[in-house]
Amino acid sequence: NYIYSGHNYHQ
């Protein structure tokens, strides 16, 4: 799943 942190996406 993807998590949006501030201005970056993490898989």
Curated annotation (Swiss-Prot):
Keywords: Heparin-binding, Lyase. It is an enzyme of class 4 (lyase). GO terms for molecular function: heparin binding; lyase activity. Inhibited by Cu(2+) ion, nitrogen and cobalt. Activated by reducing agents, such as DL-dithiothreitol and 2-mercaptoethanol. The N-terminus is blocked. The keyword Magnesium does not apply. Its EC number is 4.2.2.-. Optimum pH is 7.2. It comes from the Bacteria. Optimum temperature 45 degrees Celsius. Monomer. Degrades acharan sulfate and, to a lesser extent, heparin and heparan sulfate. This is Acharan sulfate lyase 1. It comes from Bacteroides stercoris. The lineage of its organism: Bacteria, Pseudomonadati, Bacteroidota, Bacteroidia, Bacteroidales.
